[in-house]
Amino acid sequence: MALLLTTVIALTCLGGFASPGPVPPSTALRELIEELVNITQNQKAPLCNGSMVWSINLTAGVYCAALESLINVSGCSAIEKTQRMLSGFCPHKVSAGQFSSLHVRDTKIEVAQFVKDLLLHLKKLFREGRFN
C-alpha cells in the first residue's frame, strides 16, 4: 500500500513537469491569423449580418483596439473565438461601449472588411517577427 501511495505521489509531482506552459506569442499570433483566415474564407453570407464597427489605427495597440471595436458586435458567433483570442493579447479588460483613442471615430466599416484589414496587418507583423 505504501508503495502504491509513493507511486501516485511521484507521478503527481512529475505530471507538473509535463503540464502545458504559457503559449508563446508567435504561436498565439499564428492561431489568431488562422482563425481570421477561416472567417474570411468561409464567408457565404454577410459576416455578422453586415454589422458595422469603428475603423482602427493599425499602427499601435492593434490588439486592444481591434477587440474594442469587435466587442460591440453582438449576436455574431463567427467572431466570438476571435474576440477571446484578442483578449489574450490585450493587457487590460475591454468592455462593450469602451472607446480608445486608437479608433478612427468618423469611419465605420463592415465587420468583414475590418477582419480582412486586421488579417493583412497581423500577417505583416508575423512576417516581421513582431509578436506583441
UniProtKB/Swiss-Prot annotation:
Gene: IL13
Subunit structure: Interacts with IL13RA2.
Name recorded for this polypeptide: Interleukin-13
Gene Ontology molecular function terms on file: cytokine activity; interleukin-13 receptor binding
BP GO terms, sorted: immune response; inflammatory response; positive regulation of immunoglobulin production
Main location: secreted
Endpoints of the signal sequence: 1-18
Role according to the record: Cytokine that plays important roles in allergic inflammation and immune response to parasite infection. Synergizes with IL2 in regulating interferon-gamma synthesis. Stimulates B-cell proliferation, and activation of eosinophils, basophils, and mast cells. Plays an important role in controlling IL33 activity by modulating the production of transmembrane and soluble forms of interleukin-1 receptor-like 1/IL1RL1.
Lineage of producing organism: Eukaryota, Metazoa, Chordata, Craniata, Vertebrata
Glycosylation sites: N38, N49, N57, N72
Keywords, alphabetical: Cytokine, Disulfide bond, Glycoprotein, Secreted, Signal
UniProt cross-references to InterPro entries, sorted A to Z: 4_helix_cytokine-like_core, IL-13, IL-4/IL-13, IL-4/IL-13_CS
Recorded superkingdom: Eukaryota
Family: Belongs to the IL-4/IL-13 family.
Any single GO CC term annotated in Swiss-Prot or TrEMBL for this entry: extracellular space
Pfam families noted in UniProt: IL13 (PF03487)
